[in-house]
From Swiss-Prot:
It comes from Pinctada maxima. Keywords: Secreted, Signal. The keyword Secreted applies. It is found in: Secreted. It comes from the Eukaryota. The keyword Secreted applies. Prismatic layer of shell (at protein level). Expressed primarily in the mantle with highest level in the mantle edge and lower level in the mantle pallium. Residues 1-16 form the signal peptide. GO terms for cellular component: extracellular region. This is Shematrin-like protein 1.
Amino acid sequence: MLRFIAIVALIATVNAKGGTYGIGVLPSVTYVSGGGGGYPGIYGTYGGGFPGIYGGFGPGGVYGSINSYGGVSTGAYGLYGTSPAVRGAAQGAAAASALGIASGVPSRVSGSSIGIGGGRALVSGSATPIGYYGVPYGGYGYGVPSYGYGYGYPSYGISYGYPGYGYGGYGGYGYPDVAYFGGSTYGNLATGAISSPTSGVTIPYGGALGLYGGYGGYGLGSTYGGYGYGVPSYGYGYGYPSYGISYGYPGYGYGGYGGYGYPDVAHFGGSTYGNLATGAISSPTSGVTIPYGGALGLYGGYGSYGYGPGIYGGGIYGSGGGIYSGGATIIRRKKY
């Protein structure tokens, strides 16, 4: 039985206009993954199916869940075109990214996908809030090191000594699911919806998948967050570039406010009054401005669903939206 394995770094695009659900709508997902065989697309050759301007693939679908620590677990099916392993990973990233935006905690999304034959695939990964560390995010185990508890190195979240346990996916070990998603793919289009049993809200997402071939196409380093100021930053990543921890230089950092030569890609500002919040994100690299706003659901503390702004925070019902529109880019990085 042929097994296709895709390690994916994912990029999510946030919509800039139209629609009802504001920045909770995620109009497109671009994945960076291996291809192999099939039809030429404008950016290379991809794994068979129905050719489209970006490679294309045939009918399929995805499903899965997201737990309260950002763990994503999905399945995918479909017998044609680019592997459902890749499709499932892209859809999982779309759902996790939209959930992160919806909860007011934009996240880096990463994962791996294994084709199990018969047009099916299992996908696992995690959505780590940007700038956070020291907390277990996701992790599935399955005989390989999970992104679990993090013995001794909490900023990495690798479960040393317990590679097969993990804490994410379908509730994991005591971390409840906060959302479910399902969708379909055809050609280079993907559509779906996230539903949250904890809030009763359903968020649609969808758009065109762009296929760029290869993987790791955006480099190994990390420039997410990291401000220095006397604490370990999420900087350049000496020795471990895919993690981006600044060993030996805890007070410097290379991200945030442009850092050392890394330009800012977006700026934001806003205001709050009572339980209302409004603001806008502007991207000097794309020229796009995304307004956001709405009522904050106050559930106490910080974080998503029970620990912070809640599903109604961050502008789910604010302006913006539209399923097939373009928008500004937010990068979701792989961590493997």
